[in-house]
């Protein structure tokens, strides 16, 4: 870690279609091997497909799916006197959305037998409806934090 102050974060420009930084970040996460136009096509078509199936605006579906999938609390390992405790801590908003996007994408990639557009659309719909693998992952993280609630006081040292 550098000792000379904080690192300045590069601002991510919003995407062209929805003028949203969140959508742009999601496109960047979907992108593989620098193929951004392909990633954009996948994300936009998946959002269109989800909107068509749910009969709701694309951005509403995307934002609600992200909100539903984002964890509010997680566990972090903390070493105290030779023992490592899983300490529950609150998740910062940047990391919250980043985890939600990562989990959505992992769940979509884990589904098989269909094109990525359909898998991603299905995962977005599931997250929007508070079901599916992504939501299960979030609930597992919350359950883990709840189970280790006794060690929460270590987080405030």
From Swiss-Prot:
Q: Tell me the keywords, alphabetical order.
A: Ribonucleoprotein, Ribosomal protein, RNA-binding, rRNA-binding, tRNA-binding
Q: Which GO terms describe its molecular function?
A: mRNA binding; rRNA binding; structural constituent of ribosome; tRNA binding
Question: Cellular component terms, GO, for this chain's entry?
Answer: cytosolic small ribosomal subunit; ribosome
What cystine linkages occur within this chain? none
Cell inner membrane in keyword set: no
Instruction: List the InterPro entries.
Output: Ribosomal_uS7, Ribosomal_uS7_bac/org-type, Ribosomal_uS7_CS, Ribosomal_uS7_dom, Ribosomal_uS7_dom_sf
Q: Pfam families recorded for this chain? A: Ribosomal_S7
Q: Which PROSITE patterns does this entry report, sorted A to Z?
A: RIBOSOMAL_S7 (PS00052)
Q: Name one GO biological process term.
A: translation
CDD domains attached here?
uS7_Bacteria
> In its keyword annotation, does this UniProt entry include tRNA-binding?
yes
Q: Where is the signal peptide?
A: none
- Recorded superkingdom: Bacteria
Q: How does it assemble?
A: Part of the 30S ribosomal subunit. Contacts proteins S9 and S11.
Report the protein's function.
One of the primary rRNA binding proteins, it binds directly to 16S rRNA where it nucleates assembly of the head domain of the 30S subunit. Is located at the subunit interface close to the decoding center, probably blocks exit of the E-site tRNA.
Q: Which family does it belong to?
A: Belongs to the universal ribosomal protein uS7 family.
Quote the PANTHER family the UniProt record gives: RIBOSOMAL PROTEIN S7
Name of the featured protein: Small ribosomal subunit protein uS7
* Organism the protein comes from: Chloroflexus aurantiacus (strain ATCC 29366 / DSM 635 / J-10-fl)
């Amino acid at each position: 870690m550098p000792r000379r102050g904080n690192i300045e974060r590069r601002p991510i420009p919003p995407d062209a279609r929805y003028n949203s930084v969140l959508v742009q970040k999601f496109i960047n996460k979907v992108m593989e091997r620098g193929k951004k136009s392909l990633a954009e096509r996948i994300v936009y078509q998946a959002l269109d497909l989800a909107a068509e199936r749910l009969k709701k605006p694309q951005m509403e579906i995307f934002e609600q799916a992200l909100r539903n999938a984002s964890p509010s609390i997680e566990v972090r390992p903390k070493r105290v006197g030779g023992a490592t405790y899983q300490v529950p801590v609150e998740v910062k908003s940047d990391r919250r959305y980043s985890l939600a996007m990562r989990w959505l994408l992992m769940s979509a990639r884990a589904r098989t037998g269909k094109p990525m557009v359909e898998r991603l659309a299905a995962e977005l719909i599931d997250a929007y409806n508070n079901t599916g693998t992504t939501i299960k992952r979030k609930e597992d993280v919350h359950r883990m934090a709840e189970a280790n609630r006794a060690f929460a006081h270590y987080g405030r040292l």
